[in-house]
Amino acid sequence: IMQAIGQDDGSTLGTNIPRLAINRSPEDDDGNQLPVGHFYTYDSSTGQNVYSKPVTLRPFISAMQYMHYDAVKSEYVNRSIIFKSWREEAIDILGGTKCGKIPFKERSSLTPEQLEEQRTIRCYKLVYGLLSFDKGVTAKGETTSVKNLPVLYRVTGTAFSPVTSALDLLNKRKKLMFNCTLSLNTKRQKKG
């Protein structure tokens, strides 16, 4: 959060804010069964990942960021600044904008290779907030709970719109997001 608000240039190594994500793996490296489709995050108080569904999130900051992932290198090779509005120019670390992402309606003249590269450039919705849940578990099946844990919930793809819509609804109701608590749940959807 300190980097996002300009208090830290990112040059010092420190503790990162844990990410809230959806678990898609049926087991961990130790063979423990994990709850697929549940939210998970790293809980530093227990030193392990914790899983739960549903969870609540009290959002404080909402922003977006373009990132370009290189599967061969297994790393992000470019990222834009964190921006809060589509009216802002998303300058990236390589000197371009939006990590080279081209609007869908302008892609008709691209080669198959260029189209494939476009699929590796994504816009992420970033929501910084406080995570809470009562009925969680660890990978070993121990029950746990989390209360007001600072997290980053980073979504893209099909999860981008529902998160954005929920925050837009708060804006339309003239409610400050940090005065609200969102209930997050997942639903399995099959492709095709």
What do these predicted ranges mean?
Residues 1-144, 191:
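OB-fold ssDNA-binding interfaces and closely related basic DNA-contact patches used
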